[in-house]
Swiss-Prot record:
Pfam family, one: SelO
Active site: 249 (proton acceptor)
Recorded superkingdom: Bacteria
Keyword NADP set for record: no
Keywords: ATP-binding, Magnesium, Manganese, Metal-binding, Nucleotide-binding, Nucleotidyltransferase, Transferase
Designated name of the protein: Protein nucleotidyltransferase YdiU
Enzyme kind, highest EC tier: transferase
PANTHER family: PROTEIN ADENYLYLTRANSFERASE SELO, MITOCHONDRIAL
Length: 483
């Protein structure tokens, strides 16, 4: 029997001045193209919800009982400059689903039409960008990285003009919250400190209830936001993910990866990799992400300055770098197969990264192959991947010495490495192949790629082609903010 999800909309009822209520605007010829069975199961949705009879639900044409749709208002700093009012320009929060375990999940329909915050946009999304966000959300989740999720992809016959005419599409994004740093900035710059306080009290009550009645709740909460942000970015750095548009309106208060635009996973290891071809100065380059995270937290701290004194805010911000270094160290030691911490670990890591940079080695492939090394072997299978064999041999000798300090054997170390270093990541060329087929109503590549990304650490030998290094045409794909 098909059970209707239960919606109870806290944001709608508790923060009436933080949004505009409005209805989604359906696309012509909208139909469900694909969905995440795994997420559907987590949400308690049976397969009956994903039949053609339910297309109107996923396209926003038919609201479920209890839904109260709204577009959120927020502001933000974009590329380091204050951009003023922004808000949901094409997304509508349909409602908050109440799950059996007590959690609440936003259903947010992206591409749902014009809102009061659309500015110069048309309120629409195209199939290309929707598929990219769907795949990235699923990939990041199964890599163990905090992220918003993606439930459904809707395609249509609705033409949308970008650099060329494309198919209009919609994505149902699911997350525990869509509150961003920019929500707080919006009311700070409007000189409405009571609204900032109201929002802080709301997010603490909803997501940090353990501190709701604590006199130090603001400090405890902000300190946790700082640490969540640090942990998120260390995950990005460890897996080789570049977000591309780390504006403050794209920063989740829960420390989730949100707003997948011109993102990219590293192919060749390039610390200064820029995935967004609109980022001419490299503000959001891969190796600059940790610094930008802290810069964004300073902007949030400024917005909270009416609630906490400078010393309290600075104390919380000071937790960022230690948290960043601690979590990065833990993740990178696991990538190297190290169970314990040692003074020379950083030298071992930096030595490998330097070699990879010099040779343009593939980031994911190199770490995955490293697991096949053995303590007692003077040479590793990975050696053949390097041109400068002497340099690799020198590094590998140092690495072997470090492994000798570990009690665990090769098999245990290999298990650690192969559950830390993925075999499958979402390379741009793979996403492009899925997009091109899907634009012609063939979802076979999309489905197969999605399946691989749901088990990124497993061997899946029948999908070895999806773990291949990018072909020449796939090495330099340019991705912009156009979506």
């Amino acid at each position: 029997m098909q059970q209707t999800p239960l919606f109870k909309n806290h944001y709608f009822h508790q923060l009436p001045e933080f949004y505009t209520a409005l209805q989604p605007k359906p696309l012509h010829g909208a139909r469900l193209l694909y969905h995440s069975e795994g997420l559907a199961a987590e949400l308690g949705l049976s397969s009956d919800w994903f039949t053609p009879e339910q297309d109107a639900v996923w396209s926003g044409e038919r609201l479920l009982p209890g839904m109260e749709p709204l577009a959120q208002v927020y502001s933000g700093h974009q590329f380091g400059m204050w951009a003023g009012q922004l808000g949901d320009g094409r997304g509508i929060l349909l409602g908050e689903q109440q799950l059996a375990d007590g959690r609440s999940m936003d259903w947010h329909l992206k591409g749902a039409g014009l809102t009061p915050y659309s500015r110069m946009g048309d309120g629409r999304a195209v199939l290309r960008s929707v598929i990219r966000e769907f795949l990235a959300s699923e990939a990041m989740h199964h890599l163990g990285i905090p992220t918003t999720r993606a439930l459904t992809i809707v395609t249509s016959t609705h033409p949308v003009q970008r650099e060329q005419e494309e198919k209009g599409a919609m994505l149902m994004r699911v997350a525990e919250s869509h509150v961003r740093f920019g929500h707080f900035e919006h009311f700070y710059y409007r000189r409405e400190p009571e609204k900032v306080r109201q929002l802080v009290e709301y997010v603490i009550a909803r997501h940090w209830p353990q501190w709701e009645n604590d006199e130090r709740r603001y400090e405890l909460w902000f300190g946790d936001v700082v640490e969540r942000t640090a942990r998120l970015i260390t995950h990005w750095q460890a897996v080789g993910f570049s977000h591309g548009v780390m504006n403050t309106d794209n920063m989740s208060i829960l420390g989730l990866t949100i707003d997948y635009g011109p993102y990219g996973f590293l192919d060749a290891y390039q610390p200064n990799f820029i995935c967004n071809h609109s980022d001419h100065r490299g503000r959001y380059a891969f190796d600059n992400q940790p610094a930008v995270g802290l810069w964004n937290l300073h902007r949030l701290a400024q917005a909270l300055s009416g609630l906490m004194d400078t010393d309290t805010l600075e104390r919380a911000l000071a937790r960022y770098e230690p948290a960043l270094m601690q979590h990065y160290g833990t993740l990178m030691r696991a990538k190297l197969g190290l169970f314990t911490a040692s003074a020379e670990d950083n030298d071992v890591l930096v030595g490998l990264l330097r070699l990879m940079q010099q040779e343009g080695s593939d980031y994911t492939h190199t770490f995955r192959l490293l697991a096949d090394s053995e303590k007692q072997a003077s040479r590793a299978p990975l050696r053949d991947e390097f041109i400068d064999r002497a340099a690799f041999d020198s590094w590998f000798a140092t690495y072997r010495q470090r492994l000798m300090q570990e009690e665990q054997g090769d098999e245990e170390r290999r298990r650690l490495m192969n559950t830390t270093n993925p075999k499958f990541i979402l390379r741009n060329y793979l996403a492009q192949m899925a997009i091109e087929r899907a634009e012609n109503d063939d979802i076979s590549v999309l489905a197969r790629l999605h399946q691989a990304l749901c088990q990124p650490f497993d061997e899946q030998p029948d999908k070895n082609d999806l773990a291949a290094l990018p072909p020449e045409w796939g090495k330099h794909l340019e991705i912009s903010c156009s979506s």
